[in-house]
Amino acid sequence: MSHTFFNSRLLQYKSPFGAVTANTQVTWHLDVPENFGYVDPHLVLTKDRETPVHYRMEFTGQSQGANHFQVKVTPTSSGLYFYYFDLYTDFRKICRGAGAEGFLTWTLKDSWQLTVYEPDFSTPFWIKNGTMYQIFPDRFNEGVPNKEMPFADRIYREDKTGDPYFWPTEQEEGYLNRDYFGGDFLGIEQKLPYLKNLGISCIYLNPIFEAHANHRYNTANYLKADPLLGTNEDFARLCLAAKKEGIRIILDGVFSHTGSDSLYFNREGRYGPGGAYRDRHSPYRSWYDFDSGYACGYRSWWGFDTLPEVQEESPSYVEFVCGKGGVIDTWLGLGASGFRLDVADELPDAFIEKIRAAVKAHGEDKLLIGEVWEDATTKEGFGHRRTYLRGHGLDTTMNYPFRNAAIDFVRGADAAEIADRILSICENYPPPALDCCMNFLSTHDTERAITAIADEPANGRDRFWQSGRRIPLSRMEDAVRRELLAYALIFALPGVPCIYYGDEIAMQGYRDPFNRAFYDWHSTERRLRGPLANLAELRRSCDA
């Protein structure tokens, strides 16, 4: 059918660009060929899951063989809006929607998105021209060598060069993540000069609370540092030392579940006779959902019986996390500058808003990042559209869409398609959130950057296959160049680049646990460190 032109990413057709605050006037322009004949175009704007509203467009003139129309609308409340154009002719109504490549269709193909966020939404300025560095605490650097294990069921790894264990030991029914390489707070403190020279301004630490697995996502005690890392006082000293180097530290907040082996649940009995599992009168009982309908007798995270889910609506749990003297208050008081929320899209919006209030009570400069793997503006959960990126929840999110786009690009994907994916996030995210998105190539949940870029996809192959994989030396030069190109893209895009520990020396590895090896401080790989430090310096000196 006939062609009509509109491009949501060009200011001549929609202004302002992208997301807007509530009570901001938005102007749309539409071009229709003169030879189309009579046409009466309307903007159809729909707030998410509400009734569409039609706005008649005004004719503004002719030029270059096209009739020009415009309409101005001011959304008065935050939310997710969708829009398209209806064109009424002498004969019938036709549509112009996203995905139609400029052509009119009899039926709507798709709509454009308009994100409207709260006018007072702001995010910490200090993070925006800096560079983050993610550390898996057990695997970075051991400051106190030859440790005594604080619990008998932990295995100390004296050999720092081997793969993390990926099979059950003779004492285990399944792989329990109980091998420890001994990384600690002092080890991180010792490497602060190295991180400063790399251009790092913020360290993101995977969980540090007492827990009985090396990943520490099965929290045992929220108010106590894991003894293998050090004490709460050691953490405070680390924060103070980092601050002197111009580096802030944010923590991983795991609030959707605890460990079964914890002070709160205590299925294994490590913490005496109390705990929700053993004592019906435990003060923690209301945190959990006990029901014989569950395979293990209680609701657990994705069916893992070692990770009982908490009920985030429980008043006592909310108070424990968000109240005075609670988890957030304690760790921010010790010197942390914010939190990254594990599985944020599995936390209720109301709970996230309470977490935000607790974080910001320590200052508007405190940061709250959410783990979301998709476009966070359109994410659904709990039977409704999530609202956590509109100004009253998260500051920002982890930017998996950018990560996937950067890796696909250096692996040879079509540049125009990659640009479209990147621009979609830029268009949908509120600028305060976009400016501090956590942009990365690797994390503890993904393949190492160089592995994802230059090695064969695992495609479901078992851990024994993954453990033996290394990129051939003959291909390493090309692999390093591609990784650097991907990082250059990440550094150049809106948001905050984040280097996963060891990426700067081209550490390899597929997913857990192979992406969590101990940092090789004897590595002779130097091809990435200098360029990454230069990229960090360029960001720091650039106002854009």
Feature roles, as predicted:
Residues T131-Y133, I203-L205, I249-L251, F339, ...:
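Hydrophobic faces of well-ordered beta-strands that scaffold small-molecule active sites
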Residues L30, I135, L195, L205, ...:
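Conserved, mostly hydrophobic/aromatic
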Residues V32-E34, K47, V73-S77, T89, ...:
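Short, flexible loop/turn elements at secondary-structure junctions
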Residues M1-Y133, S201, H362:
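Glycan-association/targeting regions that enable binding to alpha-glucans and other polysaccharides
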Residues F136-C202, I208-L334, I355-A361:
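Substrate-binding/active-site clefts of carbohydrate-active enzymes
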Residues P124-N129, K196-L198, K243-K244, L332, ...:
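Extracellular/periplasmic catalytic domains that process cell-envelope and extracellular macromolecules
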Residues I127, G143-Y180, E374, G412-A413, ...:
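Loop/helix patches that line or flank the sugar-binding groove of alpha-linked glycan CAZymes
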Residues C239-R248, S256-H257, S262-P273, V327, ...:
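Active-site-proximal helices and loops of the catalytic beta/alpha 8
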